[in-house]
């Protein structure tokens, strides 16, 4: 009887261990975004959807107005509070594994990390969903947000003009979150 209980317990533990990575993969990846002072400005959850990734964001303490959101090439969000205009340069440029030009309206684009603008309300909050069909959560794919150690989700001070190369005149980087496995 005791051996039977041990066997059932061991089988349950193995089944649970095998199921956990799949549950995490199906649930997506949640990223905390912080400003240059290290204060949280909210979260974004990346979920595999169709041929791309759906990003659900819940943001706070941001300047009202239209802002750009991009995926950047490095999984780094090093900020310098003394030089906010240069914050998060460690994240590199836009994620662009296919070597295209910037902008959703650019015939030679877009970068894999280019996405539509979003609006922050007068109260400093924004909640919404954006789809990026050019990236994936699948490890090993060249357009995976986890490639080369990961990427970063970036919020800029201004809206992206959707065509200027290399970054859409979106202004300083004001919030950043690291995307890693």
Feature map (PLM): residue ranges:
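N-terminal leader/targeting pre-sequences
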Residues: 14-181
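Bacterial N-terminal signal peptides that target proteins for export
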Residues: 1-10
């Amino acid at each position: 009887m005791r051996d039977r209980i041990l066997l059932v317990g061991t089988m349950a533990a193995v089944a649970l261990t095998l199921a956990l990575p799949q549950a995490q993969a199906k649930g997506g990846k949640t990223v905390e975004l912080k400003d240059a002072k290290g204060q949280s400005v909210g979260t974004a959850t990346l979920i595999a959807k169709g041929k791309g990734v759906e990003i659900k964001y819940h943001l706070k303490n941001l300047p009202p107005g239209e802002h750009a959101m991009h995926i950047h090439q490095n999984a780094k969000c090093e900020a310098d509070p003394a030089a906010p205009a240069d914050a998060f340069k460690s994240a590199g440029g836009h994620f662009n594994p296919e070597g295209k030009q910037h902008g959703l309206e650019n015939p030679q684009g877009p970068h894999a990390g280019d996405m539509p603008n979003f609006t922050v309300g007068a109260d400093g909050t924004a909640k919404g969903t954006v789809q990026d069909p050019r990236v994936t959560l699948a490890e090993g794919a060249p357009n995976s947000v986890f490639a080369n150690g990961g990427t970063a989700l970036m919020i800029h001070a201004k809206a992206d003009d959707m065509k200027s190369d290399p970054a859409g005149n979106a202004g300083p980087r004001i919030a950043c979150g690291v995307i890693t496995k």
